[in-house]
């Protein structure tokens, strides 16, 4: 497995299907790392702190596209769920014209998923 990982650039998040990363890799859990010991990793993460990717997913940076204005690279964004409401309007077919809010006593909306660790090549 280690040979397959060699092609990843230093600093690239890699989904990892195990609790323990292989030698030479760190879990991406928000921890500091020694800049002097890992200069390649420090070039990618200049603050010498890895992002905490536990329980989160990676979203492509907007970079001026207009879907997620104001975000900076490596910034964190908390979850948000809005109530859907449509007071009416014209719809073709057999519809009531109302959007309905379905509540399941959860505090977030999330897609189906499988839990992996994210790891990063240390250097």
In which residue ranges do the predicted regions lie?
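Low-complexity Ser/Thr/Gly/Asn-rich repetitive segments
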Residues: 1-123
């Amino acid at each position: 497995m280690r040979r397959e990982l060699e092609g990843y650039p230093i600093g690239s998040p890699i989904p990892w299907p195990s609790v323990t990363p292989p030698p030479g890799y760190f879990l991406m859990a928000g921890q500091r790392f020694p800049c002097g010991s890992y200069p390649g990793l420090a070039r990618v993460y200049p603050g010498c702190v890895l992002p905490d990717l536990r329980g989160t997913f990676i979203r492509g940076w907007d970079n001026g596209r207009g879907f997620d204005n104001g975000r900076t690279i490596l910034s964190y964004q908390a979850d948000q769920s809005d109530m859907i409401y449509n007071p009416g309007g014209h719809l073709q077919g057999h519809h009531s014209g109302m959007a309905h809010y379905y509540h399941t006593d959860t505090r977030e909306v999330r897609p189906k998923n499988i839990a992996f660790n994210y790891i990063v090549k240390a250097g």
